[in-house]
C-alpha cells in the first residue's frame, strides 16, 4: 500500500542503492510529521550494507560518548528477510519501510472453529485435529478494497498494494514511507 503512494515513495533504484541519505529523503516525505516514523524495516543484506557504509566513516562512527547499536536515523530497526522487501527484476530492488506508530495492527477476529475426528477400525486409532481461525489486519490510513482483494484474501492479495485504498485525508496520517534502491549498488 505504501509503495503505491508516490508522495511517500523515494525510488532511487534507477541510479542508486539504499543509503542513509536515501532513507533520510524517504523520511522527509512525511515533512513536519517525520518524527512519527518510529521504525525502519529492512532485510539483513540491507542492514549490513548500511553498517558497511558506517564502517568506512570510522572518524564519525564513535564520535559520541554513547554509541547506539542498531539505531539508524534515530529509529529502531527491524531486520527481517521478508520476501516483500526484495523484488527481482531489472534492476533487482530492495525496499526499506519507514513505519509510523500503529502502521499495522493485527487483531484476533474471535472466530475459532475446531474439529477433532477419531477413526476406528485401523491398526491404530487415528485422531486428527483441524483448527481454522480468522484475524483482522489494519493499515494506518488505508482500508481494504473487497472488490479488488476479496472478502477472504490470500497472503498474496494482502501484499498487493492496489487492494488497499488510501482513506486518510493527509498522506502524513498513513502507515509510513518507503525507500526503493538498486540491490546491486
What are the functions of these language-model segments?
Residues 2, 20-52:
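Structured, hydrophobic secondary-structure cores that serve as assembly/anchoring elements
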Residues 14-18, 49-185:
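Sequence/fold signature of self-assembling virion shell proteins
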Residues 8-25:
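Surface-exposed ligand/attachment interfaces on beta-rich extracellular proteins
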Residues 1-8:
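Short, glycine/acidic-rich hinge or "gate" loops at secondary-structure transitions
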Amino acid at each position: 500500500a505504501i509503495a503505491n503512494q508516490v508522495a511517500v515513495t523515494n525510488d532511487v533504484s534507477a541510479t542508486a542503492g539504499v543509503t542513509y541519505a536515501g532513507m533520510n529523503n524517504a523520511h522527509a516525505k512525511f515533512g513536519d510529521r517525520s518524527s512519527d516514523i518510529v521504525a525502519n524495516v529492512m532485510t539483513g543484506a540491507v542492514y549490513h550494507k548500511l553498517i558497511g557504509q558506517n564502517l568506512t566513516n570510522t572518524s564519525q562512527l564513535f564520535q559520541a560518548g554513547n554509541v547506539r547499536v542498531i539505531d539508524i536515523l534515530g529509529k529502531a530497526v527491524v531486520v527481517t528477510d521478508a520476501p516483500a522487501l526484495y523484488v527481482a527484476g531489472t534492476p533487482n530492488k530492495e525496499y526499506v519501510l519507514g513505519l509510523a506508530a500503529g502502521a499495522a495492527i493485527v487483531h484476533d477476529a474471535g472466530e475459532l472453529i475446531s474439529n477433532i475426528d477419531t477413526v476406528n477400525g485401523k491398526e491404530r486409532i487415528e485422531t486428527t485435529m483441524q483448527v481454522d481461525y480468522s484475524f483482522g489486519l489494519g493499515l494506518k490510513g488505508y482500508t481494504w478494497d473487497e472488490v479488488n482483494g476479496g472478502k477472504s484474501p490470500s497472503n498474496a492479495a494482502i501484499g498487493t498494494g492496489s487492494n488497499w485504498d488510501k482513506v486518510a485525508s493527509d498522506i502524513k496520517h498513513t502507515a509510513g514511507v518507503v525507500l526503493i534502491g538498486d540491490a546491486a549498488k
